Amino acid sequence: MFVLTISATTGYAFLQLKHTADGFITPLKGQKKLPLEVMQPVNVLLIGVDERKNDPGRADAIMLLSFNPKTKQATSLSIPRDMQVTIENGEKTKINHTYAYGGVEETIGTVEKTFDVSIPYYAKINMDGLIELVDAVGGVTVDNPAAFSWNDRRLQKDYAEGKIELNGLEASGYARMRKQDPLGDMGRQIRQRQVLEAVGMKLAGPNILTNLEKISSVLKNNFSTNVTFSEAAQLAQENQTGFENLKPLKLDGEGYIASDGVWYFFASEQSMQEAKQAIDKLMKS
C-alpha cells in the first residue's frame, strides 16, 4: 500500500499526507526514535487492533513484514490471533491478548521472542479505522477466489466468487474470514493483502484530492507508527520489487482446547522452524 500511494500521489497530496502522517509518530516506550536505514534488511510489525472507548482491545490481526532492499526480496507472515505464546511474565496466552496486557510493546516483544527476530518498527491501525478508511476512499474492488458467507453482530453477507465491490464493513469481514477458507490462515493473509492493495490503489488515484480531508482525519484518529512518512517513502522506493513479489509464509498447526479450558492454535514445530529460517535467510542475504 505504501508503494502504490507514495509513488503515485500528486505533489500536493503527498505533502498533505506527509503532514498528517508525521503527526501520529509514536515511538516505542523506552526507545528513542531510531532512523530507519532503508538500505539494510528490516522487520516491520503490522498490528490491527479492536480498540474501543474504555477498552484497550486486542490484536485482531498481526503480520510481520521482512524486507531486504539489497536482494529485492520480501516476506510476510500472518500470525494466527489464537496462537498460544509465552509472554514476558511466563504466562501462556493467546497472542492477540498481548496487546491488552502491554500494548504495542508487549505484542512486539512476544513476536520477537517467539520467532527469534528483532522488530524495531511497527504500524498499528484500529480495525474500525480500516472500515472508515475504505469508506473514505469510496469503497474497494477485490477478486474473491472462493464464495463464502460472513455473519457477526454487525454484518451478515454472502461474498460471491469473482470481482466484488465492498464498502468498509464488508471489506473488514472479507479480510477477517478464516474458517471457511480452504487455505485457512494463508487464505486470510491473501485477502488482507488484497484489501490493503485495493486501498492503496484508491489512495494513489486521481480522486484522492476530493477525499483528502476525510482520509487524513481517519488516519489521524486510527493510525500510529514509529516510521516517518519520508522514511516510508524511501522504504517503498528501495523495496518496490520486493513488495511486488512478496512471498507469504505459512504457519501450519492445529487448534484444540488446552488444559486451562481455552481453545488455542498450536503452530507445528516444522512450520515454526521454516518461518524462522526463511526470515533469517532474508535478513542475512
Specify the residue positions occupied by each region the protein language model found.
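Non-catalytic, solvent-exposed segments at the cell envelope interface
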Residues: M1, A8-S285
